[in-house]
Amino acid sequence: MDFKVSNRMSTLKGSAIREMFKAMADPTMISLAGGNPAAELFPNEILSEIAADILKNNPVGALQYGISEGNVALREKIIEFVKERENLEVSLDEITIVSGGQQAIEITAKILLNEGDSVIVEAPSFVGGLNAFRSYGANLVGVDVEEDGINIEMLKETIKSTPNVKLIYTIPNFQNPSGVTMSVEKRKALYEIARDNGIFIIEDNPYGELTFDGIKLPTIKSMDSEGVVLYSGSFSKILAPGLRLGYLIAPKNFTEKAVLGKQVSDVHTPCLPQLLALEFMNRYDIVELIGKMRELYKKKCNIMIDAMKEYLPSQITYTVPGGGLFVWCNAPGVDTLKLSQECVKEKVLIVPGNNFATDQSLVNNGFRLNFSTMPDDKIVEGVKRLGSVLKKYYN
C-alpha cells in the first residue's frame, strides 16, 4: 500500500556507510569506509563465560523487564569509572543507561527540540547525530572544525545570527569524521559561550579513551558547574558495539525526562548487555583492554599515514590523528561523492564528505578513511588503490 512519509522522516537519507556494507559481499573489496572497532579485540571468551554464569545464576535479572533508568549496579560502576577516568562527580540520579551513544543523542533531541529550532554542529560532523537532529525538524548550522577544534569566532557569530539555538553538538576527542581533538582552551571557551547564551552542549565522547599516547584532555563536562553539558559515553568502542550500551550524564531534572524518553522508545536498554558490561568490569580490568586498543590503533594509523605519504598525490591534505579511528582527507577540486563511486570500481571503499555535512546535496571535497578494521596489508593496498584513482584528477 502506498503511504505518505511524515515530515520528520522525509528529510532523512540512508547512510552511505551502511549502504557500503553491501559492497563488502565482494571478497576482493577493501573497506577503508567503516567505523567499526577491531573485532580481534572483542573479549569473546570472557563474555561467553560471563553470559553463561548470568543465565545460570541470575536468569530473571537478565531476561525480565528492567527499570528505564538502567541497572543500578551498572550505573554505580560507571560513576566509579568516570570519576577515575574523567574526573567527573556524578550521582545515581544523573545517569541513564541508553542503547548506545546514538540513543543519548536522539533522546536529547526529543527532549529539547521543537520543529524549526536550531542546532549548531561541527562541520563536518557525525552523520548519526545529524540525522537524529533532522528527525526532529531541526535547522542544522555548521561551524568549521580547525586543527584544534571548533572555530570559536565563527561559533560566536553563528549564535548571534541564528534564531532559536537550543543545542551545540560536539565530539571533542578524535572527532568523527575529522580525527581532530579540541584544545583545552577551546573547550573552556565553548563551555563559557554556551553557558552565557543559555544553550545546552551535547558532549559526545565515544573515542576519548582511544588516545595513542595515553594523554587525555579534560572533558567539557568536567568544567561544567551549571548543568550546561549533556555527556554521552559509550561501551561501543571500549568493549563491543553489538552490546548497544551507553550512558547519558545530565542534571537530575533532565535525567527525569530522559527516563520518560526511554519509556516511549524502548522501555529500557536490554538487561543482558547491561549485566555483561557490569560483570566484565567487576571481574576484569577494562583499562587493560583499552590499552590493547590504543596500541593496535596507533600501529594501524601509522601504517595508513605512511601509505598515504607514499601513494596519494601531493595535493591531498589530511589530518594525523592522535587517537580514535579516522583520518580526514581533503581533495581540492574533487567531488568526493563521484570519487567514492569510482573507488568502488577499483575495489576500495571510502566515505565521501557530503555524508557529514549539514547540506548533503552540495559538492564536498572531503572524505573519511578508517584504519581500525582492515588487516595491515589491506590498509596499504587500499590506500594504493585510492591513490591510483586520485592521480587521475591531478595528472
Question: For the regions a protein language model found, what residue spans apply to each?
Answer:
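Conserved core segment of the aminotransferase class I/II
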Residues: 225-295
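Conserved core of the PLP fold type I
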Residues: 61-198, 202, 208-226, 297, ...
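N-terminal small-domain helix-loop-helix segment of the aminotransferase-like
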Residues: 10-100, 107, 282, 349, ...
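PLP-dependent enzyme catalytic core of the Aspartate aminotransferase-like
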Residues: 1, 345, 360-395
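Conserved glycine-rich beta-strand-loop-beta hairpin in the small C-terminal domain of fold type I
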Residues: 278, 295-305, 317-330, 344
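Conserved C-terminal alpha-helix-loop-beta "cap" of PLP-dependent enzymes
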Residues: 329-368, 381
